[in-house]
Amino acid sequence: MKLISFNPFIPALIIIAIIVVSCRNPMGVQPLDEAPTRGNIRISIDESYQLLYDTQLYTFESLYVNAKIAASYKPEVEVLDDFMKDSVRTIVLTRDLTKEEREYLLANSFVARTTKIAHDALALIINPGNPDTIIRDQQFADILRGKITNWKEINPTSSDKPINVVFDNNKSGNVRYFRERFNITGNFPTNCFAVNSNEEVINYVKNNPSALGIISVNWVSDKQDSISERFLESVRLMEVGTDPKNHCKPYQGYIAERSYPFCRDVYMISRETFSGLGTGFVSFVAGDQGQRIILKSGLVPATMPIRLIEIRKD
């Protein structure tokens, strides 16, 4: 009888191969240990919403102790890149996917599902020592086009100082928003530059009297959050309007009414082909508790009815 030799390394290699295939999770097959409130996943989030999603994630994981979500906060371009390359299955952006992006995913057997979760606004912030608190949307457009370069051109009584515009990141949704809104296809003028985050924008404006910063309003709108309150105390919000008589700050009521000119929506997008943890987290943020967190943050909930109250001064 012929004896067959046993190689003890073969079973180990088979197990390793199974683990590798499972980690790749081809065609979005549901892992055995994942459910809407259980599992371990990574998601990518637009850096503009770090304060908001730190709270959302803390609350969600406190309720569902078997859920572990590792969030990466990045500029919009990098968030989308993670999603399209299947590095993450769930993302947060300030725009929906394009037709071409959806078709690409569909060609790879993925259907992207978009949920609008909030209405946001881009705030223009200035140094507390700057007296120019009002600006028209077209004046800001002319600043980004290089037609206005000095604060005196905004207000003749202002100090004769150059305007230094600071964005959060060259790859951010904030930059894209204003390029699209004002149809700017070329480079911004040399007095416009980018740092690395919304927080760095706030710190730059705090230390530079002639600076004009652009951030998501949720960084300075939650007065019950110590970080947001500290930021708000270090800068001033500009009032923005379409004409000299009608202008407002990016407060919730004006965002809800779209009276404030620079409003946008916030989306959660999932490519899960099963009811996994990403789907569960999207449902939580779009549900009652998640929407209340959004309301508290200073943004406007997208799926929760809100009531606007007018307060008159007699």
Task: State each model region's role.
Residues 10-22:
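Bacterial N-terminal signal peptides
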Residues 96-100, 109-112, 131-136, 167:
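Peptidyl-prolyl cis-trans isomerase
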Residues 2-11:
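Bacterial N-terminal signal peptides that target proteins for export
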Residues 1-2, 109:
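Residues that act as N-cap/strand-start positions at coil-to-secondary-structure junctions
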Residues 5, 23-65, 72-77, 81-84, ...:
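Exported/periplasmic ABC-transporter solute-binding proteins
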Residues 113, 117:
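Conserved catalytic cores of soluble enzyme domains
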Residues 77-108:
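Pocket-flanking alpha-helical
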